Amino acid sequence: NTSMLIADIVGITGSFSTAYGAHTGIATLPLKYYGNKDQKEKYLNGLVSGELKGAYCLTEPDSGSDANSGKSRAILSEDKSKYIINGQKMWISNGGFADLFIVFAKIDNDKNLTAFIVEKGLDGINMNPEEDKLGIKGSSTRQIFFNDVEIPSTNILGNREEGFKIALNVLNIGRIKLGAGVLGGCRGVIDHSINYSKERIQFNLPIASFGAIKYKLSNMIVKTFSCESICYRAGDDIEQKIKEFQADGKNLNESELTAIELFSVECAICKIYGSEILDYVVDEGVQIYGGMGYSEEAPMARPYRDARISRIYEGTNEINRMLIVGTLLKKSMKNEINLFKKAMEVIKDGKLKKIHYSSDNHFKSSYDLVNSLKDCFLYIFGKAAMHFNDKIKSEQEVMMNIADVIISIYVLESTLKRCEKIYLNNKNKIMIEISKASIYSNISIIRHHSIESVISYMDNNDAKKSIDFINSCTEFENFNIKEVNRNIANYFLEKKSYSLFNNFK
């Protein structure tokens, strides 16, 4: 949670956030978790103090999302004293100033990658000039070439062919931190947008008084609030699980890695949702600024450019969507979770849902809705698994639809939990409004992707029955969303800010 909070705070800096995140995350954590005693003594203290700067060398020209297909090779010398590395890495953050590289390559004809610790000053390391990027221009991004680079055989990190596992485990951490890392940028754009909309006069009125602008501000705020909710919920769940594992006798490193792997789906959700709401927020920020938003003189251009990379690094959002559903399928087949059994129960029952809303018990009614939405997920998940069997992984459109349903349910439930907690603490009615806005938007997403999923492979009669069930699961109270959005916008326009430490009093 500490590292997530720091990522949250520095996220507004864009380029510095990228450099900081690459160094403290993917460049340092492999050594923390997989380095031996000698490696940690030699390198880890310097990385932690900042005396050494690190970079992570995984991506290659022909291996991006398919990271384990990398062509870089390491050959053990005849006397077994050193490895000789050859290969090319690209899009390496911090490449221009890093002192230490975590390099992934295959030994001989191994199937899987191995990780190596490589010092920058060695002969045979060459770099291209800095990449001319769309955004995060203040960060260093280089191509790095390794030509017969000799490293001591003691600089193998972890075990042979363990590199892909190291890469995945470290990326899980990077994903949840990226979710938190977008928040500072979102808040900064929201604050600029609030203040500009109050100052900008058109038709003799501040544009903040217009419904179209209030709609934008409300959605920017609610989505950011929801992103905070999922990140700190997932972070706390991981922290609690780490403590449980430690109480059972596992050491800290083992406890952290096991807990993070257990919550890999939540890490992917945070990454996907965070990066996409950042794009949404900065885009609406430019729109609120109008023509000025398109100028480099205004505070919108840089966030707009910087935001785009977040949907690509730490695994593209498409790959992460596949990971969410693929992980659940894998765990279900191993009987680690009983999703298949629950899905079959929902499908067999097949009764249409009817959720009764009570304004006197808003949150209880809302949780009843969440349970109904979970049945909707189980239904489409089970139907797809039954239809495609082991071929479902080739049906990426269906998997992405299912992933979007999962994401929206997690986002909505997390938002409701946080709204309820704050509301019970101080009875601030804005929490009711935020929860209503989240319900409205997430129901629409869930209904859309659920229907799109089933009609992509069902015949007309089966599709109609499924759509009836989906509609019953997603039918809820018709809130006056116009007034809800206006109330939310007015609340924060009066405050003149959306702050991380806002106590909502």
Predicted segments, located by residue:
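Glycine-rich beta->alpha junctions and the first turn(s) of the following alpha-helix
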Residues: 126-228, 239, 263, 268, ...
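Internal helix-loop-helix
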Residues: 1-50, 93-100, 224, 228, ...
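A short core secondary-structure module
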Residues: 81-127
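Active-site beta-strand/loop segments that form the cofactor-binding cradle
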Residues: 1-20, 32, 49, 57-62, ...
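Charged, glycine-rich active-site and insertion segments that engage polyanionic ligands
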Residues: 259-292, 432-450
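C-terminal amphipathic alpha-helical interaction region
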Residues: 350-505
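Gly/Pro-rich turn-and-neighbor structural signature
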Residues: 57, 219-282
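Glycine-rich phosphate/cofactor-binding loops in nucleotide/flavin-utilizing enzymes
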Residues: 26, 169, 281, 291-363, ...
